Amino acid sequence: MKDFFRVIYENSGDGSLNKDKLYKTPSEYTHLYNDIVCRSYKNNVYFNVRMSYPMCCYVNNTKQHLEENANILEVKLDEQEFGRLLAVGYPDSYQKNSLNKAIFSSVNYDIAKNGDFYVTYEADTLIYQYDCDYEQKKCFGYAGKDMDLNYRYIKTPKESGKYWRNERQTKGYYNWLEYVDETGLLFRSYQKGGTRPVDGLQFYKDGVLIGDVNVPKGLKVCGYVSPYYYSYVMPNEEREIMYLYRFKL
């Protein structure tokens, strides 16, 4: 397995491929290490990714990037090779004020036991549902409440690096999806941003919003053990405390 994962980083090195080919070549992508998402279905694993070359990044090549960048990479464990590039392109909401969304251009997703993908983009209100062949079945979703969407306009990769952390910490965006097979509920977490003392959590059933509630900052649903839903562990480094929440619906 160690040798296999080393293959992921063996790209062309000098960017000798043209941009069209780069976007279609799995080995030219890199993980989003600060906010990595890894899911599995059968004997495949899926990572959120972005194009690795500066000349093809969101800011430097915006128009083509919005059309051709893949956001999810499939890896076939049995064959020890790359699979499909998925979530190619961006929703219509990214076409307007595109550079304001440069720092919020990743996806969150989950995969149900039947192989359906649920995908949400960080700065887009909708959730997209696909079958296991990645054919779209439906889209649904509502904007979160009281989100600070006053994103900074980013003109260069240098500016992106300079403002990345502050924007991610202080602005509102959709930051997690969790589908619970046992109950058929889909949870979408979102950061409200600004000085809001809480974050938000939406839950959907068959594409219908049935709740949008305030939750402790950083809460993301991890799973379900009847009769409770559980959050991921949330550390408080200053107080040296670790929180885990559970709740019923």
Which residues make up each language-model segment?
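Eukaryotic scaffold repeat domains enriched in small/polar residues
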Residues: 1-249
